[in-house]
A protein has these predicted regions:
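Contiguous, well-folded functional domains in the mature portion of proteins
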Residues: 2-161
Length: 161
């Protein structure tokens, strides 16, 4: 039995890294929509590769046509937004390849999209990737795990109601 289940009577829910790289505090994101937690609490990852995978089991709620972002609803209820880069909607899908579509049931680790980090950077965009829990206010415990290098599937957020 883990510490969360001892304290709160049930196991905590976890969100894993959807992309490999350096996990950092959300406040390091220069876009205030993310950095000031307007959309919800979260973390950001400075990607070291161009693959985005499902951070938990759930359903694809919205795969943006431009491929720069995806929102999922976790089986445990968290509403998760993964936004690859800042202002990358302006690329209109260039340098992104989408594998998942709206309504798809996904398992942790399933490939959602790929992107070309070098090409996006070369066009002048920051590829920092916010991972936001849009309904973070529904949780009494929100524990980010940042300040480390992560690979896809590593735990980056712990939640408990």
């Amino acid at each position: 039995m883990g510490i969360f289940s001892k304290l709160f009577g049930k196991a905590a829910d976890t969100i894993c890294a959807p992309v490999a790289g350096e996990a950092v505090e959300i406040q390091q994101v220069s876009d205030p929509t993310f950095g000031q937690e307007i959309l919800g609490k979260g973390i950001a990852i400075k990607p070291s590769e161009g693959r985005v995978v499902a951070p938990c089991d759930g359903t694809v709620d919205m795969m943006f046509d431009t491929g720069h972002a995806v929102s999922l609803v976790a089986d445990f209820g968290a509403e998760i937004l993964i936004h690859v880069g800042l202002d990358t909607v302006n690329l209109k899908g260039k340098h992104y390849h989408v594998y998942a579509k709206n309504g798809d049931k996904v398992k942790k680790g399933d490939l959602l999209m790929e992107f070309d980090p070098e090409a996006i950077r070369a066009e002048g965009y920051d590829i920092i990737t916010p991972v936001i829990v849009c309904n973070s206010g529904d949780y009494t415990v929100f524990q980010p795990h940042v300040g480390k290098t992560v690979k896809t599937g590593d735990e980056v957020i712990t939640l408990s109601k």
